[in-house]
C-alpha cells in the first residue's frame, strides 16, 4: 500500500549496528523460525506507522528485497564508522517525511503491536519531545528501552551537533530534551538477540 501523501509517523527499523557479540554478522538478516529477524519486526511495526525506513549500513539490496512488500526506504548513516543507534536515528529523522519517527531495533521480533499508539498518546499528553518505552517486571523493576521510542524530527539538528561532538549515548541525548517514559508490563515483548545464545532463546519463546 502506498504511503500517505502527508504521513504523521515514520517507522524506523534500526539495522545498522556491528553485532560484535555475534561475530559481526548482520543481525537483522539472521533467521528466527526461518524468517529474517528484520522481517519479523517489519510485520509488527509497519501497520503502526505511515511510512517505513530501514537504517542499514550493510546489505542494502537484501533489506530492500525483504522489505519490498512494505514499500520501505533503505537509508544509511552519514558516517562510515558504525557510530551506534544515534546515527541511525539521525539518518531516519532526516529522511522521514513525517514529523515523528518511531524507532525499533531489528532484532526484537515480538515488539508490542500497540507500541506506537501508546508512545504517541504519551507524547501528546505530556507535550514531550521524546516518548520512550520502559519495561516493568513482576518485581516492579523498571528497565528503560531507549531504542523503542517516538521522537520529533525537529530534534535532528541538535542530535547532529551532539554526534559531531562525539556523544554516542542514547539516554544522555534524551536527557537533553523533554522525555516521557511509557510503561509496558510484558517485558518479553522487548526481548532481543545480542548473542547467539539469545537468538536461540528467542526461538524457544
UniProtKB/Swiss-Prot annotation:
GO cellular component, one term: cytoplasm
Keywords (A to Z) from UniProt: Cytoplasm, GTP-binding, Magnesium, Metal-binding, Molybdenum cofactor biosynthesis, Nucleotide-binding, Transferase
E.C. no: 2.7.7.77
Major localization listed first in the record, in broad terms: cytoplasm
Role, per record: Transfers a GMP moiety from GTP to Mo-molybdopterin (Mo-MPT) cofactor (Moco or molybdenum cofactor) to form Mo-molybdopterin guanine dinucleotide (Mo-MGD) cofactor.
Domain notes: The N-terminal domain determines nucleotide recognition and specific binding, while the C-terminal domain determines the specific binding to the target protein.
Positions bound to GTP: 14-16, 27, 77, 107
Reaction(s) catalysed by this chain's protein: Mo-molybdopterin + GTP + H(+) = Mo-molybdopterin guanine dinucleotide + diphosphate
GO molecular function: GTP binding; metal ion binding; molybdenum cofactor guanylyltransferase activity
Family: Belongs to the MobA family.
Localization (cell): Cytoplasm
Annotated SUPFAM superfamilies: Nucleotide-diphospho-sugar transferases
Positions that bind Mg(2+): 107
High-level lineage: Bacteria, Pseudomonadati, Pseudomonadota, Betaproteobacteria, Burkholderiales
Cofactor(s) of this protein: Mg(2+)
Protein's name according to its UniProt entry: Molybdenum cofactor guanylyltransferase
Assembly, per entry: Monomer.
Amino acid at each position: 500500500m502506498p504511503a500517505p501523501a502527508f504521513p504523521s509517523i515514520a517507522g524506523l527499523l534500526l539495522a545498522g549496528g556491528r553485532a560484535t557479540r555475534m561475530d559481526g554478522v548482520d543481525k537483522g538478516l539472521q533467521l528466527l523460525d526461518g524468517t529474517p529477524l528484520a522481517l519479523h519486526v517489519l510485520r509488527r511495526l509497519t501497520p503502526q506507522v505511515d511510512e517505513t525506513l530501514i537504517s542499514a549500513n550493510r546489505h542494502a539490496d537484501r533489506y530492500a528485497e525483504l522489505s519490498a512488500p512494505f514499500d520501505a526506504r533503505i537509508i544509511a548513516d552519514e558516517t562510515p564508522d558504525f557510530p551506534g543507534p544515534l546515527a541511525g536515528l539521525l539518518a531516519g529523522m532526516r529522511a522521514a517525511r513525517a514529523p515523528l519517527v518511531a524507532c525499533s531495533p531489528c532484532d526484537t521480533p515480538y515488539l508490542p503491536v500497540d507500541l506506537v499508539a501508546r508512545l504517541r498518546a504519551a507524547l501528546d499528553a505530556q507535550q514531550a519531545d521524546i516518548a520512550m518505552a520502559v519495561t516493568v517486571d513482576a518485581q516492579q523493576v523498571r528497565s528503560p528501552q531507549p531504542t523503542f521510542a517516538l521522537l520529533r524530527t525537529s530534534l535532528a539538528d541538535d542530535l547532529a551537533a551532539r554526534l559531531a561532538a562525539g556523544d554516542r549515548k542514547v539516554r544522555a541525548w534524551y536527557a537533553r530534551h523533554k522525555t516521557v517514559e511509557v510503561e509496558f508490563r510484558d517485558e518479553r515483548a522487548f526481548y532481543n538477540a545480542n548473542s547467539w545464545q539469545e537468538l536461540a532463546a528467542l526461538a524457544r519463546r
